């Protein structure tokens, strides 16, 4: 395993790449758990299905990134959500919003999606190896679409 990855004359160490990917994995775990928990409490059936599917998408995104880390020789890739406060930091206190109906739950989900967008934006600012950058770019496009869907659903329920 090489100790450095060179891109555009800027060297990003494998450790920096690993840390960048771990931060995205952490936010994906939060999203996976957040979408799942909220899906259990939404009253709108189409939203329930969307949120359940989105939880699975985040699990798949996480698996794709973990596979990249394994290919780079990192074998301990199990993460448990964001270090800075877990799901409550990025998805709010879901339990506090359960009594607020779908609109309140959708606000919570949108805040979580804002955090996910920010994590991807931060990662994509870095000079990552091209295959990793392509993977994150593709995932980020999906996260943006999901954010917009959640926001539109929230706005429709004002």
Predicted regions and their residues:
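N-terminal/domain-start segments enriched in small and hydrophobic, helix-friendly residues
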Residues: 2-26, 80, 87, 152-156
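Carboxylate-rich helix-loop segments that flank metal/cofactor sites and access channels
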Residues: 4, 64-117
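Alpha-helical bundle segments that constitute or directly flank the non-heme di-iron/ferroxidase center
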Residues: 9-43, 103-127
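Alpha-helical scaffold segments that form or flank carboxylate-/histidine-based iron centers
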Residues: 16-24, 45-63, 102-106, 131-143
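Generic structural concept
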Residues: 18, 25, 29, 52-55, ...
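Charged/polar positions within long, soluble alpha-helices
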Residues: 33-40, 63-70, 74, 92, ...
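Conserved alpha-helical segments that form or flank metal/cofactor-binding pockets of metalloenzymes
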Residues: 47-83, 150-153
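Preference for long, well-ordered alpha-helical segments
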Residues: 105, 109-158
């Amino acid at each position: 395993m090489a100790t450095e990855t060179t891109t555009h004359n800027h060297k990003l160490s494998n450790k920096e790449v690993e840390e960048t990917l771990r931060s995205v994995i952490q936010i994906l775990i939060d999203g996976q758990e957040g979408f799942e928990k909220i899906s259990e409490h939404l009253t709108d059936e189409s939203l329930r299905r969307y949120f359940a599917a989105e939880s699975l998408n985040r699990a798949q995104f996480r698996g794709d990134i973990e596979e990249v880390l394994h290919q780079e020789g990192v074998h301990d890739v199990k993460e448990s959500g964001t270090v800075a406060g877990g799901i409550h930091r990025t998805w709010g206190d879901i339990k506090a919003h359960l009594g607020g109906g779908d609109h309140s739950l959708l606000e919570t989900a949108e805040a979580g999606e804002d955090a996910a967008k920010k994590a991807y934006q931060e990662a994509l600012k870095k000079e990552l190896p091209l295959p990793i950058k392509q993977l994150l770019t593709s995932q980020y496009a999906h996260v943006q679409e999901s954010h917009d869907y959640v926001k539109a659903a929230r706005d429709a329920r004002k």
